[in-house]
């Protein structure tokens, strides 16, 4: 499976993953809206939006 792994608004980069899902976490801090992407579907703290998906590069 191929997932995107760039941070926030960086140019798109991808990684090959052993997991069968990709995630996109979104939250806000003093620098504005932050976005993290990667493999799997992690647990997140309250206040963090998590989207998980199951197709290649679906978390862009």
Swiss-Prot record:
Disulfide bridge partners, by residue number: 3-22, 17-39, 41-52, 53-58
InterPro entries: Snake_3FTx, Snake_toxin-like_sf, Snake_toxin_con_site, Toxin_cobra-type
Keyword set, alphabetical order: Acetylcholine receptor inhibiting toxin, Disulfide bond, Ion channel impairing toxin, Neurotoxin, Postsynaptic neurotoxin, Secreted, Toxin
A single cellular component GO annotation: extracellular region
Tissue note: Expressed by the venom gland.
Top-rank taxon: Eukaryota
Protein's cellular compartments: Secreted
Sample GO molecular function, one term: acetylcholine receptor inhibitor activity
Kinase listed as a keyword: no
Functional summary from the UniProt entry: Binds to muscle nicotinic acetylcholine receptor (nAChR) and inhibit acetylcholine from binding to the receptor, thereby impairing neuromuscular transmission.
Family under the similarity heading: Belongs to the three-finger toxin family. Short-chain subfamily. Type I alpha-neurotoxin sub-subfamily.
Name of this chain's protein: Short neurotoxin 1
């Amino acid at each position: 499976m191929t997932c995107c792994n760039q941070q926030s608004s960086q140019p798109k980069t991808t990684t090959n993953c052993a997991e069968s899902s990709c995630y996109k976490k979104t939250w806000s801090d003093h620098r504005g809206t932050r976005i993290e992407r990667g493999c799997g579907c992690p647990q997140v703290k309250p206040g963090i939006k998590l989207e998980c998906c199951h197709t290649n590069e679906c978390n862009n």
